[in-house]
């Protein structure tokens, strides 16, 4: 947990993490019926759509009430903001008090080791160090 968060931000971050665990998966209307549809969310717009009208016994619809608190939106559960890193030089611009490093998936193992070594020297938190 990031120690520089004030009490209100810590409280909101706990709420955000609890909400994230409870949040349901939103599926597209009739995603189970046709394989070609996929399950990615699409807003129901049909004139007679039961899902659009929020009738009973229907899955939940995306709504503003499912969002996390705005003060901690975009934060990692540890309380840091993530910064995507592709090479060692990008580590210099990271603020260790508020930001944590996530190494890009396109980075190979040799460069990954260099990034991890340099981030330890700079006291940076690596989220996917392995």
From Swiss-Prot:
SUPFAM superfamilies: Ribosomal protein L32e. Transmembrane segments: none annotated. GO terms for molecular function: structural constituent of ribosome. The keyword Ribonucleoprotein applies. InterPro entries: Ribosomal_eL32 (IPR001515), Ribosomal_eL32_arc (IPR023654), Ribosomal_eL32_CS (IPR018263), Ribosomal_eL32_sf (IPR036351). Pfam families: Ribosomal_L32e. GO terms for biological process: translation. One of its GO terms (cellular component) is cytosolic large ribosomal subunit. SMART domains: Ribosomal_L32e (SM01393). The keyword NAD does not apply. Keywords: Ribonucleoprotein, Ribosomal protein. Belongs to the eukaryotic ribosomal protein eL32 family. NCBIfam families: PRK08562.1. This is Large ribosomal subunit protein eL32. It comes from Thermoplasma acidophilum (strain ATCC 25905 / DSM 1728 / JCM 9062 / NBRC 15155 / AMRC-C165). The lineage of its organism: Archaea, Methanobacteriati, Thermoplasmatota, Thermoplasmata, Thermoplasmatales.
